[in-house]
Amino acid sequence: MTAMTIKDLKVRLEAVSSLSDPFFEELKADKRLGVQKAVSSRKRALEAILKEEARLEAMLTYEQALYQKGFQAIAGIDEVGRGPLAGPIVAACVILPKGCTIKGLNDSKKIPKAKHEAIYQAIQKKALGIGLGIIDNHTIDRVNIYEATKLAMIAAINQLKGSVSKPDYLLIDAMTLEVPIPQQAIIKGDASSMSIAAASIVAKVTRDRLMLDYDKAFPGYGFAKNAGYGTKEHLQGLHQYGITPIHRQSFEPIKSMTLR
């Protein structure tokens, strides 16, 4: 064993996919520090992979229970954009195949923005159906953000497109909808349900793209970076350039600005 270079050992370790692989036991006899460091590194990597696989499997708990009850087209629903001062609220409805997991999927707020697009594309490839609901700032001002959220979610259900476009059960992130479909509201569902997490990413990427377009139409507010949230740059833009057609006039400080 000692005849093998550490470089060659590292290459072979990369091919090891199980913590019970006998190669680890063989390497115990090799006392070289570089070898033992490589072994520890590979074991940590495998432990991280197992932990991630277990997390993803746990995110199918709600879906698996529903499959056992006979439901087939289970849709996850989530929204993005309740808090911003500008732009629409966007909801997505996603139906995934039975037992489908998507690498790296989680609540969109817990995923680095650089990874959003790749996960979004993976969802687009695997999903049986995807629907979007987009409610603009004018409607938000007219009905309030809570009601606008429900409108966006219902629109997303109605806009489902794909090989499966009629869900027989809804898993919704912390909301109940007045639709004739069995449903369950799950607190923090975007972190505990694969279907809701998929909807979270689809809604997030869709809204971010819209805000990029708005950044070009209304420069000076930082919409490309802040997505309409009330950052320092955004508030400075409001002070310097005023209110745009996409600002929510029922939200402060815009509401007070309209009264001056």
Curated annotation (Swiss-Prot):
Copy out the cofactor comment: Manganese or magnesium. Binds 1 divalent metal ion per monomer in the absence of substrate. May bind a second metal ion after substrate binding.
Q: Where is it mostly found? A: cytoplasm
GO molecular-function terms, A-Z: manganese ion binding; RNA binding; RNA-DNA hybrid ribonuclease activity
What is this enzyme's catalytic activity, as reactions?
Endonucleolytic cleavage to 5'-phosphomonoester
Name a biological process GO annotation: mismatch repair
UniProt cross-references to PANTHER family, sorted A to Z: RIBONUCLEASE H2 SUBUNIT A, RIBONUCLEASE HII
Tell me what this protein is called: Ribonuclease HII
